[in-house]
């Protein structure tokens, strides 16, 4: 812009400076094709041009090609299912898993399934299987109640938090097996309006001291008319814990119970078979006196 003649000297100097600046300032977007760096006018340090950022450039949209729709019916029809099942990589793991599950179920049903009451015992147990558990109460001189603990301590009973034997009567209701000792007929306590038989208190006290809160093993034979299971019971006691004792035989030796002389419905299991007395008036060899008589006790079923 031409300056008027009345412009001052300072304005003329500013105008000349602007013209010099316009000559030295490069035009935006102008690049040197021969070199990527330019020399500064007042120094020898080359000025490097930064690379062009193309990340913000908008690329044209690409046309996506979708795969054709899958025909499931055709794929199922063409797949060789029989060959896949017969493949050892599929067949062997399947057989191992199935066999393991069936084996665990069988072991649980045969050895680890808890029996709540006597009426739940399968007939396959009679004369073949035994029941292991802890005695929770003694009702009479020849019967008691047992809480079944299948597997014992190896299965976690009495040391795992969820495998405890209940102690309260409410918790034990309908959860114990009523067992009657086989081969003996101890005197009964008063019940159902009947008076107590002689030595019933002594027999009850002895059996309570001998069995209460102890782990026993019962070999079951049958169920009687009162819903109890008749069994030969063994217990281990100190100072000889490795020797198991027949509870019914120990009562006979203590003179606290006679041999059961009923003509029918009597089971003599274990060691009691060889010590059975013949019916009164019959012929037979009596067992040793020390087995059946004691101080103030019974001998040969006489009271």
Curated annotation (Swiss-Prot):
TNase-like domain segment(s)? 129-290
Assign the protein's first listed, main location to one coarse class. mitochondrion
Compositional bias ranges of the Low complexity kind: 45-54
Matching PANTHER family: EBNA2 BINDING PROTEIN P100, SERINE_THREONINE-PROTEIN KINASE 31
Gene Ontology molecular functions: endonuclease activity; metal ion binding
**Which residues are listed as membrane-spanning?**
91-107
InterPro entries registered for this protein in UniProt: SNase_OB-fold_sf, Staphylococal_nuclease_OB-fold
Q: Which organism is it from?
A: Ajellomyces dermatitidis (strain ER-3 / ATCC MYA-2586) (Blastomyces dermatitidis)
Asked whether the UniProt record includes Hydrolase among its keywords, one would answer yes
Q: In what way does this protein cross or attach to the membrane?
A: Single-pass membrane protein
Q: Does the keyword Nuclease apply?
A: yes
Entry keyword set: Calcium, Endonuclease, Hydrolase, Membrane, Metal-binding, Mitochondrion, Nuclease, Transmembrane, Transmembrane helix
Provide the protein name: Probable endonuclease LCL3
Listed EC numbers: 3.1.-.-
* Residues binding Ca(2+), per UniProt: 185
Report the superkingdom from the record. Eukaryota
């Amino acid at each position: 812009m031409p300056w008027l003649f009345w412009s001052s000297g300072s304005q003329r100097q500013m105008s000349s400076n602007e013209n010099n600046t316009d000559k030295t300032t490069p035009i935006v977007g102008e690049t040197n094709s021969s070199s990527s760096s330019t020399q500064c006018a007042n120094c020898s340090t080359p000025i490097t041009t930064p690379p062009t950022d193309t990340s913000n450039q908008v690329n044209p949209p690409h046309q996506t090609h979708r795969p054709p729709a899958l025909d499931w019916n055709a794929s199922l029809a063409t797949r060789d299912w029989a060959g896949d099942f017969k493949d050892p990589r599929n067949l062997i793991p399947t057989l191992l898993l199935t066999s393991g599950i069936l084996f665990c179920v069988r072991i649980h049903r045969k050895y680890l399934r808890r029996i709540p009451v006597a009426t739940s015992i399968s007939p396959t147990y009679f004369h073949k299987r035994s029941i292991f558990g802890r005695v929770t109460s003694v009702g009479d001189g020849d019967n008691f109640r047992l809480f079944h603990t299948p597997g014992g301590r190896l299965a976690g009973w009495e040391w795992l938090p969820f495998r405890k034997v209940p102690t309260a009567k409410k918790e034990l209701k309908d959860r114990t097996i009523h067992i009657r000792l086989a081969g003996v007929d101890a005197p009964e306590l008063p019940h159902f309006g009947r008076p107590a038989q002689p030595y019933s208190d002594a027999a009850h006290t002895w059996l309570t001291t001998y069995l209460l809160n102890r782990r026993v093993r019962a070999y079951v034979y049958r169920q009687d008319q009162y819903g109890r299971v008749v069994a030969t019971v063994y217990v281990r006691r100190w100072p000889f814990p490795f020797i198991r004792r027949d509870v019914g035989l120990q009562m006979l030796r203590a003179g606290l119970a006679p041999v059961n002389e009923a003509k029918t419905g009597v089971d003599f299991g274990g060691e009691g078979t060889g010590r059975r007395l013949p019916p009164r008036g019959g012929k037979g060899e009596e067992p040793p006196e020390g087995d059946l008589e004691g101080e103030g006790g019974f001998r040969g079923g006489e009271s």
